[in-house]
Amino acid sequence: MIFGIKAQKEVDSLGLHYELTPTDFTSKVADCYDLYFTGVHESKIYAQLLLPKKSSAKHPVIFQFHGYHSDVGDWLDKLAFVSEGYVVVALSVRGQGGESEDCLQTSGGTLKGHLIRGIEDGPEKLFYRAVFQDVYQLTNVVSRLPFVDSSKMASYGVSQGGALALVCAALCPKVKRTFVQYPFLSDYRTAYGLEVTQSAYEELAYYFRYRDPLHEREEAVFAALDYVDIQYLVDRIQAEVIWAMGLEDRVCHPKTQFAVYNHIQAPKKLYFYPEYGHEYLPKFNDKIHQILGGK
């Protein structure tokens, strides 16, 4: 079972209710806005939106997604892309470090993280199902804004954000390029069998330790997580995929990343960093800039 048409139809039934209001942050190159829209479970979802200053033209878009537990970051971080003519939209993942609400009702434990949120209620109550739906709704809203050229869209993210950048490309065929670094949310069985307590997947170990110490529900747990395993979504991607991987990564192990990369049928390029782990990967942002047309 994978994230499918039913989940997208639930989002489509919400309509496109959003608010776009100027923010207090000012810039000589960008007009900056707070974007709020209605997500599933009546949650109010937030994103930063920046566009080239006082421009009446339509612009290409780059969607940005942040790492696990974090937030959208500073406005300043996005100005480089805006100065090159892009609209930048940075999603605040529900229930994490930013302003987005998470009104999903679940039972069971959530110790140590969101990956197991809703796991005892079945795949349709999983936290990340709602997050994937938010990503889909974000693309619906942004692609219809009057200053957006929806034929020129890209996505970018690191770790959790890398996973969501791939989800964005999978659920929105208008996305033409996606740039990712060491994405999270993949190949949960393999991740659990590795150094799980030192990884982004450590909450799986805590779940079994405290909620299912005899592993009587193990098969049901992993079957539910298949629903939000990005390796089963990425075959939908039509965009070009540019990927960076640190071969010493033990937070999102290369084995779990290859499970995803190998399922991508679209054009793709993988950059290896043999001496690097789950950390800043130099030169990759410069490559993104060059690929997006800043040569």
Predicted features, each with a name:
Residues 236-237, 243-245, 249:
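Short beta-strand/loop motif that positions the catalytic acidic residue
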Residues 73, 79-82, 86-133:
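Cap/lid segment of the alpha/beta-hydrolase catalytic domain
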